[in-house]
Amino acid sequence: MSRVIALLVACLLLASCSSFPRPGGAPPSDGLTAQAIFDRSLAAHGGDLRRHPGDINLSTDGRWYALIQRIQPVVTDAGFRIRSEERYRPSEGLYAVRHTGPDGTKHVVRSTAGLRVAYNGTETDDDEKRAATAMTNDAFRMFHFGPTFFLDRMASLERLPDAREDGRRFHRLLATLRPGFGRAEQDRAVLWIDAGTARLYRIHQTIDGFPTTVGAHVDTTFLEYRAVGPYLLPVRFLERVRGPLRIKAHEWRVTGIDLDRGWRAADVIDPHGFGGAAARPATPIAP
C-alpha cells in the first residue's frame, strides 16, 4: 500500500506542480493602494478584534480528505482534529482549542507565554507534534478570525493584479509575514478580497513552519459568513493544496458561535477540558 501511495504522490507531483504567486504585472489603475484595500476589508469584518474586551467562542465540525491524511499525518492529526471547541480572548492573545476525533481529545492553548499541547489529558513534549501544532494553530486562528491576524506580523503588503472567479472580481494582496506560521521565520500569503463587499474570499499561503511542508502552499476559501455582534465571521471553509500538488485537503464549518461569556484563563487551560463559563459548547447556528 505504501508503494502505491508513493507512486500516486509522484504522479501528482509531476502532473500538477504549481508555483506560489509572485509580484509581477501591472495592478489596476484604480488608484487603490494595497493598504487601503486591506483597511477596507478589516472594517468590513468589524474592525480590529484585538480591541474586543471580551471572548469569542466557536464550535466546528469537518472532515479531512484521505490522501492528505496519508501524505501529512502529523500535520492533519486527523485522529484528533475533526470537531473543535474554540475559546479566544483576542485582547490578551489567548486562544484555546479543544479538538476531538476518533482517537480522543487534543487540547491546545496558545498564549503570550507560549504553546501547550495535550493528548487525552496528558501534556506532550513531542517536538514534532508541537511544531506541527504551532503551525496549524496559527493558521486556524487566521481562518476563523480574518484580517486581524495579519496586524501583528505583516512585514510588507503589496498589490497583485486583480483576479476574476465565477463572474466576481477580487483584489489580491501579497503579504509577507514575519514570523510566519508556527516556527517559520517567514511565510507569504495572498489575500483575495471581494472588490464589491470587501470580504475575504480566499487566503493562499505558504506553510514553511514544519519540515514536511516547506515549499508547499495551500489555499482556503471562505464560502459563507455570519454576522455575530459587531463582527462578520466566516463559517464555511474549503482548504486545498495548490503546490507542489493540487488536491482537496479539508472542509469544515462553524456550527456554533457566541460572544462574551466572561470566562477566565483558568477555565481554558486544563488539558482535561474547559471549565466554568467556558465549559458549554458554543451556541448553535442554523446550517
Regions found by a protein language model. Give the residues of each.
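Short structured motifs
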Residues: 24, 44, 156-161, 219-222
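Gly/Pro-enriched, hydrophobic low-complexity segments
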Residues: 166-269
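C-terminal motif of bacterial Sec signal peptides marking the signal peptidase cleavage site
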Residues: 13-16
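Flexible, processing/modification-adjacent segments and terminal tails
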Residues: 29-32, 36, 111-187, 207-214, ...
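Short solvent-exposed loop/turn micro-motifs enriched in small/polar/acidic residues
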Residues: 79, 101, 155, 184-186, ...
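Bacterial signal peptide processing site
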Residues: 18-21
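N-terminal mature ectodomain segment of secretory-pathway/periplasmic proteins
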Residues: 29, 35-124, 156-158
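Sec-dependent signal peptide recognition
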Residues: 2-10
